[in-house]
């Protein structure tokens, strides 16, 4: 049986070392730009290079997130950044936006691409599409049921990655506008979500002003907003 890769996030160099110390085979991290890991300390270009060298000395891997949904102005700086990541032998980049994917293939053709969970890949046909585009791995959307993962693999024979711990967004993998609405400048699609779905809410119907329906939660979660944490550790053997 093929060995599964254990991948952990690294918000800064110290956490990177801890991830490897406790058994991670690879770590993913964000740079100071173009990453949805906005509230991590993140890594400067030089720190990314040092992280790659450190990981490779241990026989481990580094993946860098380049998974924002960019505006046109971002494309002024992305080519040089992607070329730099290729030059320092980053093991792969995580990309969600087709425009960045296309650019990466053009300016850094030797850089492996993993399709980020932010791309909301939920089915075998989409996985096959990314495979045909040249992706080496697809990180499935968190909404994909565990029972579907085997079927997706059998129909694509694509390298797949899935989250086994962490928050479940109420929207498809971060496509939420609540954070923008309530804060005006904290964009969930740029890694700045304040998780407004975890606030306490009441529901009001327009024709019944002053009558508040509390958004309650039971063992199955809430029925209006359903943010929860996932935990699949019971499905894995040591």
Listing of model-derived features with the role each one plays in the protein:
Residues 143:
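Active-site loop and adjoining helix of the penicillin-binding protein/serine DD-peptidase-beta-lactamase fold
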Residues 124-125:
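Conserved nucleotide-cofactor-binding alpha/beta core module
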Residues 112, 134, 138-140:
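Acidic, glycine-enriched active-site microenvironments
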Residues 1-121, 148-238:
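Active-site pocket-lining/capping segments in soluble small-molecule metabolic enzymes
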């Amino acid at each position: 049986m093929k060995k599964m890769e254990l991948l952990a996030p690294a918000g800064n160099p110290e956490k990177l070392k801890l991830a490897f110390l406790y058994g991670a085979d690879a770590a993913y991290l964000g740079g100071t730009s173009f990453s949805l890991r906005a509230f991590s300390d993140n890594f400067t270009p030089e720190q990314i290079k040092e992280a790659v060298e450190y990981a490779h000395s241990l026989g481990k891997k580094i993946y860098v997130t380049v998974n924002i949904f960019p505006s046109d102005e971002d494309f002024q700086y992305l080519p040089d950044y992607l070329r730099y990541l290729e030059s320092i032998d980053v093991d792969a980049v995580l990309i969600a936006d087709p425009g960045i994917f296309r650019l990466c293939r053009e300016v850094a053709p030797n850089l492996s691409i993993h399709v980020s969970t932010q791309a909301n890949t939920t089915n075998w046909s989409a996985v096959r599409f990314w495979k045909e585009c040249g992706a080496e791995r697809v990180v499935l959307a968190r909404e994909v049921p565990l029972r579907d993962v085997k079927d997706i693999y059998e129909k694509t024979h694509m390298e797949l990655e899935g989250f086994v711990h962490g928050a479940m967004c109420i929207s498809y993998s971060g496509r939420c506008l609540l954070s923008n609405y309530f804060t005006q400048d904290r964009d969930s699609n740029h890694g700045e979500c304040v998780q407004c779905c975890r606030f306490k809410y009441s529901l009001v119907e327009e024709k019944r002003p002053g009558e508040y329906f509390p958004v309650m939660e039971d063992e199955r979660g809430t029925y209006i907003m359903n943010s929860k944490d996932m935990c699949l550790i019971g499905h894995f053997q040591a």
